[in-house]
Amino acid sequence: MRKILSILIIITLASCSKYQKLMKDGTPQEKLDAAKKYYGDKDYLRAQPLLEELLGLYNGRKEREEIYYLYSYSYFGTEDFLLAGYHFNNFATTYALSTKKEEALYMSAVCKFKKAMPTELDQTPTQNAINALQTFINQYPNSAYVSECNTKMDELRMRLLKKVYENAKLYHSLGYYNSAMVACQNAVEDYPDMVKRDELTFLMVDAAYLFAQNSITKKQLERYSETLMKVKEFNREFDTDSKYSKPVLKIKNKTEAAIAELNKE
């Protein structure tokens, strides 16, 4: 076992020594050949420094376009999507007449897609990714990448919808009823295809009732009236066979009773 380990160490050291010698003394062509080989082997960490140096060595020459193309992908290969996206976009600007411009712009949008954060975190990168993918589709409506862009945008939209839905429910569960009403209202208005739309509309009714119930007396009549307006909105949109129809009816009855009681005072 020790003998095998020793052999592996020797091979690794020899490989490192060869790479360092190439970086120090290799000709531009030798470095280019090696960079392509490392890239082909998906050894992006070794390919990247070579490609970066070659960008300067081949400045102004036709080979630089391919070098920059590989350099951009090397960052994508190491999952550094911030720099990959920057370089893909810069490639498209630098080589505006390149046959790879369309691909580079698509990959720049894909990098934004990859950077989009999980649902529980800030969704600004998610919206940025949707915008980037839509911009690509607008620019290249007949591109072979359009279908993939649409698939990715659908995934991102579902992520946004989930976040909006969870935020609205969280406000309600924490007792922030006014915030819950606003969040639910915004969700159903901004996202017509919102998942569990009927649940959010019900929560809006329930939050309106609880907000009125927990208000000071002089504010209650106005807020109970607003609750009845939310009830009407729910009934206009959803059939009586909705699983929330009965709970909404109960809220309506309790609200009307509360209004009647307040009017006696």
Q: Can you annotate each of these PLM segments?
A:
Residues 44, 81, 126, 177, ...:
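TPR-repeat structural position
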Residues 16-34, 261:
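Bacterial Sec signal peptide processing site at the extreme N-terminus
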Residues 31, 68, 105, 112, ...:
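TPR repeat positional signature
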Residues 108, 127-210:
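Extended amphipathic alpha-helical interaction segments
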Residues 62, 96, 113-121, 154, ...:
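Short coil/turn linking the two alpha-helices of tandem helical-hairpin repeats
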Residues 57-64, 92-101, 120, 134-151, ...:
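Short solvent-exposed coil/turn linkers within tandem alpha-helical repeat scaffolds
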